[in-house]
Amino acid sequence: MSLSKRELDELKPWIEKTVKRVLGFSEPTVVTAALNCVGKGMDKKKAADHLKPFLDDSTLRFVDKLFEAVEEGRSSRHSKSNSDRNRKRELKDVFGDDSEVSKESSGVKKRRIPRFEEVEDEPEVIPGPPSESPGMLTKLQIKQMMEAATRQIEERKKQLSFISPPTPQPKISSSSQSERLPIGNTVQPSQAATFMNDAIEKARKAAELQARIQAQLALKPGLIGNANMVGLANLHAMGIAPPKVELKDQTKPTPLILDEQGRTVDATGKEIELTHRMPTLKANIRAVKREQFKQQLKEKPSEDMESNTYFDLRVSITPAQRQKRTFKFHEKGKFEKIAQRLRTKAQLKKLQAEISQAARKTGIHTSTKLALITPKKELKEGEIPEIEWWDSYIIPNGLDLKGGTSSKKDEYFGITNLVEHPAQLNPPVDSDTPVTLGVYLTKKEQKKLRRQTRREAQKELQEKVRLGLMPPPEPKVRISNLMRVLGTEAVQDPTKVEAHVRAQMAKRQKAHEEANAARKLTAEQRKAKKIKKLKEDVSQGVHIAVYRVRNLSNPAKKFKIEANAGQLYLTGVVVLHKDVNVVVVEGGPKAQKKFKRLMLHRIKWDEQTSNTKGEDDDESDEESVKKTNKCSLVWEGTAKDRSFGEMKFKQCPTENMAREHFKKHGAEHYWDLALSESVLESTD
């Protein structure tokens, strides 16, 4: 439920105090947002969402307090409205009734309800200790007010020709108050004094109550507006002027004074500059709060540690501080040394790879050759051999390695003191032209492009017809639109028209079929298209893969290798040797990918192979069963040209024969790689 403007004005001071208590400082933006939430009748959830950007974690607590204050304000206004209805009293409730006084003269005096008793009963308005309130009247001020009221009464009596003593009369008792007033225009002096004393007593109580209210309002500025001015006006209307009360701790705002030019001036007329409050960001607010918190920590008095029995003056207390980070400059040449070290390491690895590759090419891989190369005599520790074992394989036998001049025939041919730097050639496979991906249209774009093309072709035909270059096409007549196209002709001779329409339909169907037949490929064209799709362009380089199979005696597996190589248009060779069956294939990357999946995944090499040698070789069969058959990829890469033709099988009983077959095609290193892996596997 939304609140009125008056209720929002009453609620605004409380919201300002709550914001200051929650945030630690006043923020007009939050106050305005809270007033908007209450004024629009939002519930707690919506108000919390609206105020969360301003208050963060304190939002729920602030919203609960806000709605509690709104409910208290509604209940207080409701009770106040009920009390206002009962507050309308007649004059007899204040001054008493003559008939009632005469009837109850013998009894106890009737209690008269003061005007401000209801206000005095409210615990929220009257503060606890009256002496502490800055706006409460002192005893001296009340005495001055009483003397002023007495003087006014005396002057009034003189005007009414009543004689009364100058001193103020004391309070009359209950017996004197119960006297009946005479009926007539004349009033007795005693009765007039009684009335005046009652009026003075009521005025004194009203002044005390008004002073308390003023003190309470001074603590809460702007809560009820100018309520104190209303009370002062009532006192002046009664003829009693209360003395001025100086409030030292008054928190009312300074009145705004403007000169003729609209500038802000003080009481002396001097121009002053007002502080302009501008909205700020949340980050700035947090920064201010952080600085205030640090200042409070600095100003916090330190504890008296000297009184502690465990305090040692010799130990210095140094707070934990973060060390400042300084610049650390690298020495000159540091990264050059690191790069040189990495280059040296890479060259060493490359040299080791070249040495191992040369050893494989020369055939230094079997255990027998290694045994021949190793020195026969054992050298003692610290003894230097005449020749190293790796040089003994190269240097011819009978060479005198002792001191002396060597003859010209012992000199090596082609060895000089010059270093040959071969010309650098570009790699045959890598192309300098960048690879660009084609742009593929979506289905929607393809349809749009097709519509545009057909529309342009149709426009071109229409232009030719319009210019007379070609006759206009016949109307496309169907059975469904027969009557609409031909009209009266169809009505006159329907049979003739139907035959004409069917002839046109057959003509269109025939033209369509002829166009399809013209576009259809012949058997040779389809075959060439399929071959072109399977054959790949190897002008930039041929992809080569070398496989090693332990046992390739099964004819079914041989047929699979040969058939798939022919279907994928791969070239190569299969060399059959005991425990070393080498398969070399050459072709494009797509075909190599399919053949690799065939060799490593599709063919089950560990299946039981057929015994082609008969029943005589029982021992060899047992050994083959113990060794599980498998296929491994030895090497794959690229070369400039093909080395082999159509896929063929070659039976080689010895290693030299197999190597010679590869050497004839310039690919003996394939055999060396496969054989070295087989030797290493057998030694393991």
Curated annotation (Swiss-Prot):
InterPro entries in the cross-refs: Pre-mRNA_splic_Prp3_dom, Prp3, Prp3_C, PWI_dom, PWI_dom_sf
Origin superkingdom: Eukaryota
Cited Pfam families: PRP3 (PF08572), Prp3_C (PF06544), PWI (PF01480)
| GO (cellular component) term, any one | nuclear speck
Keywords of the record:
mRNA processing, mRNA splicing, Nucleus, Phosphoprotein, Spliceosome
- A biological process from GO: mRNA splicing, via spliceosome
Does the record carry Phosphoprotein as a key word? yes
Show the coiled coil region(s).
Answer: none
Q: Which residues form the PWI domain?
A: 1-87
Q: Where in the cell is it found?
A: Nucleus; Nucleus speckle
Record SUPFAM superfamilies: PWI domain (SSF101233)
* Residue ranges with Basic and acidic residues bias: 73-107
Record region (Disordered): 73-109, 162-183
User: Its biological function?
Assistant: Plays a role in pre-mRNA splicing as component of the U4/U6-U5 tri-snRNP complex that is involved in spliceosome assembly, and as component of the precatalytic spliceosome (spliceosome B complex).
Q: Which named protein is this? A: U4/U6 small nuclear ribonucleoprotein Prp3
Q: Which gene encodes it?
A: PRPF3
